[in-house]
Curated annotation (Swiss-Prot):
This is Large ribosomal subunit protein uL11. It comes from Prochlorococcus marinus (strain SARG / CCMP1375 / SS120). It holds the Pfam family Ribosomal_L11_N. One or more lysine residues are methylated. The gene is rplK. Transmembrane segments: none annotated. One of its GO terms (molecular function) is large ribosomal subunit rRNA binding.
Length: 141
């Protein structure tokens, strides 16, 4: 018989830098999860993605065991890295924060494809282009 899930916790943590301090400790501690075991496993899985914020979805079971799934970095983080800017424009209608080219857009779309609600790369590129536009980042050919 399958174990019953008691909680699903969603966190966004720096890759390879999870520690028992907030927000990890309180979020996992209230469900009785072994915090250090999670931190070690998360850091081992995300070691190669250093510098990115990696969202994680933790499923906690009745017996206090857990499993987790790491997602791809948020599109906004990938766009700011590609454009070489610190953050997007405060008012995307008036000011441009930077620009990315079509090749960079395609690379970001390929990275995000597993987490997007898309079936092909063209529709994923449209989703990422919309995110870039909302951040004040233009997409050039």
């Amino acid at each position: 018989m399958a174990k019953k899930i008691t909680a699903v916790i969603k966190l966004a943590l720096q890759a390879g830098k999870a520690n028992p301090a907030p927000p990890v400790g309180p979020a996992l501690g209230q469900h009785g999860v072994n915090i250090m075991a999670f931190c070690k496993e998360y850091n081992a899985r995300t070691q190669d993605k250093a510098g990115f914020v990696i969202p994680v979805e933790i499923s906690v079971f009745e017996d206090r065991s857990f499993t987790f799934i790491t997602k791809t970095p948020p599109a906004s983080v990938l766009i700011t890295k590609a454009a070489g800017i610190a953050k997007g424009s405060g008012d995307s209608a008036k000011g441009q924060a930077g620009s990315i080219n079509r090749a960079q857009l395609e690379e970001i779309a390929k990275t995000k494809l597993p987490d997007l609600n898309c079936n092909n790369i063209e529709s994923a590129m449209k989703v990422i282009a919309g995110t870039a536009r909302n951040m004040g980042v233009s997409v050039s050919d």
